[in-house]
Every structure is written in structure tokens, then in C-alpha cells.
Amino acid sequence: MKRPVAVLAGIGRGVPEQVMTNEDFASIGIETSHEWIMERTGIAERRIAREPEQSTAWMAAEASRKAMERAGVNAGEIDSIILSTASPDRLLPSTAVDLQAELGASRAAAFDLSAACSGWLYGLTVGEGLIAAGSAETILVVGSEKMSSIVDWSDRSTCVLFGDGAGAAVMRRSRDGRGILSSYMRSDGTLAELLYRPHGGARVPFCENVLSERSHYVKMAGREVFKHAVRSMADAVDRALDGAKLTASDIDLLIPHQANIRIIEATAKHANVGMDKVFVNVDRYGNTSSASIPIALDEAIEQGRVGKGSTVLLVAFGAGFTWASMVVRL
């Protein structure tokens, strides 16, 4: 097992107060039911950012301030800000620089990272590398998503799945043996069109046809995504445990990406971890993309499921396809 380079010094989450239940879909003309959604996804409700000021950067700032407070860090100490999002507030410049301005982190380098639901773990891995290289000592890594702005609210297959929220971590150099014990990242671009936003980018910019065809919204081939998600999450679990030279019995808590309860259960089964050692909050938040793992980790700490010295396994998959995992000693 390697000696950790970087430790997660503070975690925080920021979620909008507005709750949308499964029953609420009837009010917007979606033919579905609580039972139908729960049976297929395990989702009962999700948070929706409906107020004008509740942007991706706003939620990121809410989570970041809590993480910074818990880490005992002020904005002037932050060297780098890495913000993972699939729902940036605008295409140019990055949402990270808006977050930087909101926090007053004037000496930080700030940039966005795009790896969909795996993005927060990608960000932690990049941050660990910056600390190892001596390029930074204190890094803010955020996953923030306003998924409600990029889903088609007339498409039952996608709009019931997603929610809004943000999670953040302050990373610092490890000095006591706690921190990241292993990390793993993979991608397979041949699967990109299983889960994607077809148009609205540089290849096919926004125009009347894009808007009328609603092709700027998330499209998903659900069955194929499920199959590849289970396979990639299993690979990620194995690689993280092997990298840390640990077994499932050494893990205090498994925190998988909160996409779908069936994927979570399949991941736990492959990892040989009982569901009593798996953190689940997909029922209350839905799929918040790259924010899901930091939100879950923050709640797990808050609920006393894990604490200082606990060993957690984090594992994610997302559009791209991307997948990633990490073993962390808190």
C-alpha cells in the first residue's frame, strides 16, 4: 500500500430545498407513477433548483463553503479549484471561475472538468497529482450539477432519473497516513452515444432545428447503459481494491454513484459487500451526476456511518463512457 499523498480535509454539500416527488410528475403531464419509478430506479424524490439564483456555481459555492469551514481553510489558501460538471452555467468561460469569484479565492487556478458522473473522482485524482507534483498544497474539488436544465421534461425515460445538487472536498497534503490509498480512471469513447446530448455544441450549434427536435437535451439508451454500468463499476471496484492491496472486508463503507438502486445492488454484490455497508441516498436525491458521491460521503459522515480513520471505497460510472474508483482513508 502506498503512503497517501493527499487527504480529504473537509467535505460539504449544497442542495436546493425544492423537493420533487414521483407524484409531482403527473402535474407536468408525464404518464408515470411512484410505483413505476421506484421499481425501476429506487428513486422516490429529487431536489430541483427552481429559483433564478440557484445556478450550478451557486450550488457549488454552498458546498464549497461548508467543506472549507470543516477543513479550517479560507479562500486565500486555495491554490486550485477543480469543478466537475455536465451542466455548466455557460459554455465560456468555465463555471469554476464563477465559483472562484464567488468564494474570493483570488490566488487559485480554476478550471472545469468534464467526465460526467465520474467527474468528481477524476477531479480528486487530478488534485492528488497536483499535490504530488508540488504544484499545489490546498485544492478545492467540486461536483455541481443542475441536471434539471439539461433533461427533456417530456421524456419519461430520463426526466424521472435526475436531480440537482453539489458536493465538495478540500484536499491537502497528507501528513499522518490518512488520504487516498488508490485511484483508478478509465474511458471508452466508442460508447459515447449511449448517453449524451446530441446537439447544441460546436459540431451542431444551437438553431431552430435543434430546439424543435429537442436534441440539446440528454438522450439515453437505458438498457445498454445499465449493462455497461454494471460491468464498468465491477472493473472499478476490483482495480481500486487491488491498487490499495485491500479486500472487501477492509472497507468500512462502499459509496457508489447514486444512479439506480439496481446498479448499486449489483456493484455491492460484485464487491462482496453487504448492503448494510453500502451508502444509499438515491431514493432522496435521484442521480445528481458528479455531485452524487460527495453528497453521499458528506451525509455518511454526518450520520456517523464513517469518521476519521474509516476506509471508504468510492466508485462511479458516467457518460463517455467513463468510470473511476478510489479507496480513501478519511
Model-predicted segments: where are they?
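Acidic, glycine-rich active-site loops and adjacent beta-strand->loop/helix elements
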Residues: G14, S84-D89, A115-W120, G143-S148, ...
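A contiguous, well-structured pocket-lining segment that forms one wall/lid of small-molecule binding clefts
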Residues: N209-V282
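Condensing-enzyme catalytic core mediating Claisen C-C bond formation in acyl metabolism
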Residues: M1-E51, D155-K227, R231, D235, ...
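Flexible, glycine-rich active-site loops centered on histidine and acidic residues
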Residues: A132-A166
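Beta-strand segments within the central parallel beta-sheet cores of soluble alpha/beta enzyme folds
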Residues: I37, G76-S84, F111-S114, A136-S144, ...
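Conserved beta-ketoacyl condensing-enzyme motif
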Residues: L8-G10, P52-C117, L121, L241-A268
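Catalytic phosphate/nucleotide-handling subdomain of diverse soluble enzymes
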Residues: I295-V315, F321-L330
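Conserved catalytic cysteine-centered active-site region
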Residues: H34-W58, A86-I139, A268-L297
